[in-house]
Amino acid sequence: MEATVVATTQLTQDSFYQPFSESLEKQDRECKVLKRQRSSSPELLRCKRRLTFNGLGYTIPQQQPMAVARRNERERNRVKQVNMGFQTLRQHVPNGAANKKMSKVETLRSAVEYIRALQQLLDEHDAVSAVLQCGVPSPSVSNAYSAGPESPHSAYSSDEGSYEHLSSEEQELLDFTTWFDRYESGASMATKDWC
């Protein structure tokens, strides 16, 4: 009796899946024929069994393989460009090349900090230049002009009482700026005399 139940069940399952299995066999044959016809085509080399559920009232939308391949290639190129950009940015950010691996977020944060520091440095330089071009030199500034242009250490470095509120970096910047401005004005004067 068990053999009869198993045989009946098997017969019912076979009749239910028969149209579906015939559809799969047909697709396999078509895929093999297409592979033989154009084996060099990349989309046909990746020929996968595509199931159609027409009998169930549902069809799976099929995308164009070449369009998908082009879209994937564009995305790979975009990601590659982004990664190369971050690699270049890491090389220009302080301590970026020294660190073993900075994440993209860390790289961007470091770049923002670096840009802010450079902007602050420019602002300070502009402020110092404006004070020096004002034409009202303080005694320490006039002493600074008496030092030779060959020395980056001007009289500012010995007169620390006039800018105690500045940090050591700001003091060095002020010393260098004073020396550079004197050197630059001396070079422009020599150029005018030479012409």
Swiss-Prot record:
Its main location: nucleus. The keyword Repeat does not apply. Gene3D superfamilies: Helix-loop-helix DNA-binding domain. InterPro entries: bHLH_dom, HLH_DNA-bd_sf, MASH1/Ascl1a-like. It is found in: Nucleus. In the 24 hours embryo, expressed in hindbrain close to the anterior and posterior boundaries of rhombomeres 2-6 and in ventral cells close to the floor plate of most rhombomeres. Also expressed in the telencephalon, diencephalon, tegmentum and spinal cord at sites distinct from those expressing ascl1a. Not expressed in the adenohypophysis. GO terms for cellular component: nucleus; RNA polymerase II transcription regulator complex. GO terms for molecular function: DNA-binding transcription factor activity; DNA-binding transcription factor activity, RNA polymerase II-specific; protein dimerization activity; RNA polymerase II transcription regulatory region sequence-specific DNA binding. Keywords: Developmental protein, Differentiation, DNA-binding, Neurogenesis, Nucleus, Transcription, Transcription regulation. GO terms for biological process: brain development; chordate embryonic development; endocrine pancreas development; hindbrain morphogenesis; neuron differentiation; positive regulation of neuron differentiation; positive regulation of transcription by RNA polymerase II; regulation of neurogenesis. Pfam families: HLH. Residues 66-118 form the bHLH domain. Efficient DNA binding requires dimerization with another bHLH protein. Transcriptional regulator. May mediate transcription activation by binding to the E box-containing promoter. Involved in neurogenesis. Involved in maintaining rhombomere boundaries in the hindbrain, probably via up-regulation of delta expression. May mediate transcription activation by binding to the E box-containing promoter. This is Achaete-scute homolog 1b. It comes from Danio rerio.
